[in-house]
Amino acid sequence: MSIFSLLPELWLLGLVCALFVASISDKKQSVASWLPMAAGLGVLAALFALGERGEFLYAAYKLDGLSQFFKLLIAFGFAVVTGIAAGNKEGKDLTPDYFMLLALSAWGLMLLASCVELITLYLALELSSYSLYALIPLRGQDRRAAEAGIKYILFGAAVTALALFGLSYIIAAKHTTYLSGLAATSWSFADAPMAVIGLTLFLAGFFYKLALFPFHFWCPDVYQGAKNETAAYVATIPKLGAVVVLVRLAAFVAPHLEVTTILAILGAVSMTAGNLAALVQRDLKRLLGFSSVAHAGYVMLGLAAGSAAGMSAAAFYSLAYILMNLAAFYVVCAIAKNDENPSLDDLDGLYKRAPALAMILAVAAFSLVGLPPTAGFAGKLFLLSAAWDQGYHWLVIVAVLNTAISIYYYLSMVRHAYTGESDAPAIVWPRGYLIFGGALAVLVLLLGILPAPLYDLAAQAAGQLHP
């Protein structure tokens, strides 16, 4: 094992340092010209380190299949967000410190993916969060951004207190903070009531990141108030950090125990609350915010199943989720006027004004619903199968009903784009930027048509947690 095992983290840390130097330099030059390429090299670094294994920091930091898989997803998502931001008209005016905060958050999430000890988990979680506390309010003089930032900080502080309180319960009951030690003990409420209560409270910190009900109240307001590019990041990449930790924690809790029952119930309520609230939204980012709440509920199907198939499905669905959500936010950023929040009415006549954007939006919407042959369909199929095999039949039925509900508001976006009429002028974008969005749509379709390679990769990672 060499220092090259940590290549993804080191590359992103180097990028943070380069952006920091650029932000304090007397010459305030735009970094939009070189940053997407540098972020793309980070994806190659994550691919290079995909097979690396090892332990650091007294076995508190572990390189395994799961961590390397999620580091690849984080690097890919960061590269896409920087590409969207740098290619956007308003994004060219973004300063180096804006991108530095994005990179610092992504670096914290990469560290989070490898942490297998509760205290280091908590520190990595906070590292990834602090930069977002500063990033979300950055939207000129828009008061909604300040409101969004305050809500994110206040909710984050409250949930952090809960997580720390739960951590103290776990330490008191189990006398260890290493996940390997925790996995070797019983997690039945009858055997360890204090530990189960502590774990439930500790999970709250990651439910907050995932925007799972009832820790979701910040989500639509933050999406609506933050810059469009910032919302694209907050809606996708931090979710990966939450999922990888939840997969690790759920792996040592057997199905149908109290904790997994709580996960199943929260998943069902989150799906229902998110979809019902999204039905009445007109603001696109707010709609996608409540959509995130619903998708957090879908992820719970795999975690509640508690099997290797369930963990694999949750990891695969995370990839599908960031692809289809980034494609949707790509369109949001492209149609926004003067960095304003677009509404459903702004989609009217999009098939005439920008046919490529209308097609990308349609692919993203179909995948968010879960229609074949998209990544969303394959991901939901794996989740439903894993939950059904473990006897969560009622949860599968709730998920299917919620998928039917979501058809209305997702396809309403497509309806506005293809049947609405508008006198607005055509939307003109550089060909390279449109090709970038088209590549996202192609990946969404490709992952739905050929899910096996990446699902097998996720299954190998989950198999290490369930030998």
Curated annotation (Swiss-Prot):
Which InterPro entries does this one have? NADH-Q_OxRdtase_suN/2 (IPR010096), ND/Mrp_TM (IPR001750)
Entry-linked PANTHER family: NADH DEHYDROGENASE
Task: Report the protein name in the record.
Answer: NADH-quinone oxidoreductase subunit N 2
- Provide the primary localization: membrane
Q: Name one Pfam family in it.
A: Proton_antipo_M
EC numbers listed for it are 7.1.1.-
Q: State the protein's purpose.
A: NDH-1 shuttles electrons from NADH, via FMN and iron-sulfur (Fe-S) centers, to quinones in the respiratory chain. The immediate electron acceptor for the enzyme in this species is believed to be ubiquinone. Couples the redox reaction to proton translocation (for every two electrons transferred, four hydrogen ions are translocated across the cytoplasmic membrane), and thus conserves the redox energy in a proton gradient.
Return one Gene Ontology term, BP aspect.
ATP synthesis coupled electron transport
Annotated localization: Cell inner membrane
Return the GO cellular component terms, semicolon-separated. Answer: plasma membrane
Which proteins does it associate with, and in what oligomeric form?
NDH-1 is composed of 14 different subunits. Subunits NuoA, H, J, K, L, M, N constitute the membrane sector of the complex.
Task: Name the cystine pairs.
Answer: none
Q: Catalytic activity, per the record?
A: a quinone + NADH + 5 H(+)(in) = a quinol + NAD(+) + 4 H(+)(out)
Its topology with respect to the membrane?
A: Multi-pass membrane protein
Q: Of which family is this protein a member?
A: Belongs to the complex I subunit 2 family.
State the organism named in the record: Solidesulfovibrio magneticus (strain ATCC 700980 / DSM 13731 / RS-1) (Desulfovibrio magneticus)
| Transmembrane regions | 1-21, 31-51, 66-86, 99-119, 153-173, 195-215, 231-253, 258-280, 287-307, 315-335, 357-377, 394-414, 434-454
